[in-house]
């Protein structure tokens, strides 16, 4: 039987980073301050803030942010008294210069994120973060796309570069509970005892909280979650729900549940221009194993070309597209449009391919 945790869990909030996807990266500085103040009052351990795609993610490909990463980071740093300010960096999107600037703005935790089979590209960023004295975390995205043993070897690479914690990141919300269990057991087999592990869940199959609980049962130290589940796709594990479940299990988490409940309903949920929930489109993400932040891009392409969002998402999953390939969503839409036109014996309208 799995042992119950006796240590205090590290609660990592991602409302102001992953949650940015849910509103197309349009958080105002006032939104950021209000959310950060509520999270700080609830005593979460860290608050991650950046464009949804990490430092320097604001771009034509990913979507432009309402503010710069440094403005958002500084707003959180000026607000909090307890929580540490965290940020996310994807090598190839964010640079060492961006990391230094984020540190100067107040970030003290960085999660260096790569695709689950590409940990080797994180070396210089992890090493530099350690030089800065940051709490340095490896973040293995789309963890469902490789085996537990192979994922563990990638985690070991990140550990060897200096990562103090390595995450199983279910970017597609596609992992089942046994999948999570097997990945944490594989981590335990190869990582040093002092290296922490973390779980970042998405709720596309409604398993965000369940998978986080399984991870903790397997020795996970850090849990990502967001207020009202605010995040890409069907969102992350809802923070207030996870804390309520952890409380009922008798786990030490250090957070004020009622403050989180109020913040979720009174501050965060009203910001959603598209409900963050499991529905036809977000369920397709988890079913097909598609990167959750593709949702809004796929919906835009579907509207533009008169296609079904689910059809685009399922095709993206079939082609095993990964984070960073947002530009391919339009290509997939055009391929589907051409296929449909060919079946109907029609040419693709020239306006559609312009």
Swiss-Prot record:
Gene3D superfamilies xref list: 1.10.8.60, Aldolase class I
Presence of the UniProt keyword Manganese in the record: yes
Binding-site positions, substrate: 17-18, 171, 200, 291
Residues marked Transition state stabilizer (site): 17
Gene Ontology molecular function terms on file: 2-isopropylmalate synthase activity; 4-hydroxy-2-oxovalerate aldolase activity; manganese ion binding
Keywords (A to Z) from UniProt: Aromatic hydrocarbons catabolism, Lyase, Manganese, Metal-binding
SUPFAM superfamilies named in the record: Aldolase, post-HMGL domain-like
Residues annotated for Mn(2+) binding in this entry: 18, 200, 202
Gene Ontology terms describing biological process: catabolic process; L-leucine biosynthetic process
Residue ranges constituting the Pyruvate carboxyltransferase domain according to the UniProt record: 9-261
Protein's UniProt keywords contain Transferase: no
InterPro entries: 2-IPM_HCS-like, 4OH_2_O-val_aldolase, Aldolase_TIM, DmpG_comm, DRE_TIM_HOA, PYR_CT
Active site feature: 21
Record field: catalytic activity: (S)-4-hydroxy-2-oxopentanoate = acetaldehyde + pyruvate
EC number from the UniProt entry: 4.1.3.39
Alphabetized PANTHER family for the sequence: 2-ISOPROPYLMALATE SYNTHASE 1, CHLOROPLASTIC-RELATED, HOMOCITRATE SYNTHASE-RELATED
Family, similarity comment: Belongs to the 4-hydroxy-2-oxovalerate aldolase family.
Protein name (Swiss-Prot/TrEMBL): 4-hydroxy-2-oxovalerate aldolase 2
Organism of origin: Cupriavidus necator (strain ATCC 17699 / DSM 428 / KCTC 22496 / NCIMB 10442 / H16 / Stanier 337)
Source lineage: Bacteria, Pseudomonadati, Pseudomonadota, Betaproteobacteria, Burkholderiales
């Amino acid at each position: 039987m799995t042992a119950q945790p006796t240590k205090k869990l590290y609660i990592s909030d991602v409302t102001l980073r992953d949650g940015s996807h849910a509103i197309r990266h349009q958080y105002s500085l006032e939104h950021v301050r209000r959310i950060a103040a509520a999270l700080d009052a609830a005593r979460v351990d860290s608050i991650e803030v950046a464009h949804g795609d990490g430092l320097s993610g604001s771009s034509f490909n990913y979507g432009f942010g309402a503010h710069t990463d440094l403005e958002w980071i500084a707003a959180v740093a000026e607000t909090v008294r307890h929580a540490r300010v965290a940020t996310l960096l994807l090598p190839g999107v964010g640079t060492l210069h961006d990391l230094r600037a984020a540190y100067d703005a107040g970030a003290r935790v960085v999660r260096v994120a790569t695709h689950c089979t590409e940990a080797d590209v994180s070396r210089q960023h992890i090493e530099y973060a350690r030089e800065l004295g940051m709490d340095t975390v490896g973040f293995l995205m789309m963890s469902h796309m490789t085996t537990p043993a192979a994922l563990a070897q990638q985690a070991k690479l990140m550990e060897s570069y200096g990562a103090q914690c390595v995450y199983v990141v279910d970017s597609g919300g596609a992992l089942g509970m046994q999948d999570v269990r097997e990945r944490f057991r594989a981590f335990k087999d190869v990582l040093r005892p002092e290296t922490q592990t973390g779980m970042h869940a998405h709720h596309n199959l409604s398993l965000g909280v369940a998978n986080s609980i399984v991870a903790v049962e397997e020795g996970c130290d850090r849990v990502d979650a967001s207020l009202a589940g605010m995040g890409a796709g069907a969102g992350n594990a809802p923070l207030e729900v996870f804390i309520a479940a952890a409380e009922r299990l008798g786990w030490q988490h250090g957070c004020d549940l009622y403050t989180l409940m109020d913040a979720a309903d009174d501050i965060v949920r009203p910001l959603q221009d598209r409900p963050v929930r499991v529905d036809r489109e977000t369920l397709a993400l988890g079913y097909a194993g598609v990167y959750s932040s593709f949702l809004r891009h796929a919906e835009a392409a579907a509207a533009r070309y008169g296609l079904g969002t689910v059809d685009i998402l399922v095709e993206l999953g079939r082609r095993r597209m990964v984070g960073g390939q947002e530009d391919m969503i339009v290509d997939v839409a055009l391929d589907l449009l051409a296929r449909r036109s060919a079946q109907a014996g029609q040419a693709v309208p020239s306006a559609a391919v312009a």
